[in-house]
Design a protein with these regions (language model features):
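Periplasmic polypeptide-binding modules associated with outer-membrane biogenesis and secretion
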Residues: 2-5, 30-79, 85
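Soluble periplasmic/extracytoplasmic beta-strand elements of cell-envelope proteins
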Residues: 3-5, 18-20, 52-56, 62-68, ...
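Solvent-exposed coil/turn segments that connect beta secondary-structure elements
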Residues: 5-10, 58-60, 68-72, 87-90, ...
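Periplasmic/extracytosolic POTRA-like scaffold domains at the N-termini of outer-membrane
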Residues: 8-48, 93-114
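Extracytoplasmic
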Residues: 48, 58-62, 79-80, 86, ...
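Extracytoplasmic segments of membrane-associated envelope/inner-membrane machinery
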Residues: 65-138
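Soluble extracytoplasmic domains of inner/organellar membrane proteins
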Residues: 111-171
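Extracytoplasmic/luminal low-complexity segments enriched in Pro/Gly and acidic/polar residues
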Residues: 154-199
Length: 199
């Protein structure tokens, strides 16, 4: 029978992992071990927050489950439903909003939101944690435009398809600015102060 040890990385509880994997204390150890690949696929399918799962025999009667989670980036409210936005672009219906990135103006644009989230999921946590909110604001000239409001007071204009790569330049550009302002990463990369006519 299985004494169960679970290694978690962020927000999933031991109970959530047991429920999603159908592995629990008292279950026959070798049955779990032989079905580990199927149980891993099942857990990932049931809960998109599980990115990967490893099941390891640690003794004659014990298992260890290691869970790698999809980072929870923030939340989006679309069509009166609240979604947890995950780093790989998946959306998971949720009842409570967290304090991560607020995704705004994505109503009716689930694919656009998923693409934007997957791009922001590429960012280093130091940059990602500096984002307060992201707003989808397409224009005639820039149909894939997102506007990112940073916690440090700057605003970033970007293309939702490339923002994950271009935001890597943000710390250097922001450090070189004398005043708070706009950093435009839609085409190329340049910045200007708020209220400046010189764009």
């Amino acid at each position: 029978r299985v004494p169960l040890h679970t290694t978690l990385t962020q927000v999933l509880t031991k109970e959530q992992v047991e429920k999603n994997t159908n592995i629990y204390p008292g279950r026959f150890i070798w049955g779990v071990y032989l079905a580990r690949h199927q149980l891993t696929k099942q857990a990932i399918r049931k809960n998109p927050q599980i990115k990967d799962l490893r099941i390891k025999v640690t003794g004659p009667q014990s298992l260890q489950i290691s869970v790698k989670e999809n980072a929870l980036l923030g939340t989006a409210v679309m069509d009166n439903d609240t979604y947890a936005v995950l780093a790989d672009g998946q959306l998971q219906r949720t009842k409570n909003a967290d304090n991560g990135i607020a995704y705004k103006r994505f109503d009716g644009h689930k694919k656009v939101l998923a693409t934007t989230a997957a791009q922001l999921g590429k960012l280093k946590p130091a940059i990602r944690n500096g984002i307060s909110s992201v707003s989808y604001q397409p224009t005639k000239d820039y149909p894939d435009r997102v506007i990112i409001y940073m916690r440090d007071g700057n605003t970033v204009y970007g293309d939702l398809n490339t923002i994950g790569d271009k935001m890597g330049y943000y710390p250097a550009i922001a450090a070189s600015m004398k005043n708070k302002g706009i950093i435009d990463l839609q085409v190329g990369a340049y910045s200007y102060d708020y209220g400046s006519k010189d764009k």
